Amino acid sequence: TTDHCGSCTKCLEACPTSAFVEPYLLDATKCISYLTIEYKSEIPAELAGQFGGWAFGCDICNEVCPWNLRFAAESTVPDFRPRGDLREAGEDFFERMTEGDFQAKFADTPLARPGLARMRRNWRLAWASLRGAQRRAATERQ
């Protein structure tokens, strides 16, 4: 195999939950992508506050990777474009939704995988982590 990383550790340093135990070794139980998409229980409190607004998956490690950035390009496939209804969604977006509303809006999307209950959990944690980050930033400015 080819080692594209060399001595780079940008993904390890950028991961908000320290999911990378060491180079090339990811502890999925700390990974925001795993926790928000696959994990079925309550998210551990020590990780929940570190979501930085991520409610479904996380791309931080990919976004900082110099190798990946060489090939990064926004998709031209319409189905892969950001959905406006989520970009404009407020804090209670999923809380107000019924199961029928959720299915009508997201049955044909990856958000169907965690389902409404876990999206509610994730959405609450994402908003809470953003509020926490704002509080920390305000405190640091003082």
Report residues per predicted region.
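Conserved helix-loop functional segments at active or binding sites
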Residues: T17, V21, I37-K40, S129
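Acidic/histidine-rich catalytic neighborhood
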Residues: S33-G57
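Glycine-rich adenosyl-nucleotide cofactor-binding module
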Residues: T1-E13
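Iron-sulfur cluster-binding cysteine motifs and their immediate structural context
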Residues: K10-S33, W54-F56, I60-D79
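Long, compositionally biased charged/polar accessory segments in the mid-to-C-terminal portions
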Residues: A104-A107, A112-L130
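Amphipathic alpha-helical scaffolding segments comprising HEAT/armadillo-like alpha-solenoid repeats
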Residues: Q103-K105, A133-Q142
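Alpha-helical adaptor scaffolds
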Residues: G84-R96, A104
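Alpha-helical transmembrane segments of multi-pass membrane proteins
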Residues: M97-E99, S129-G132
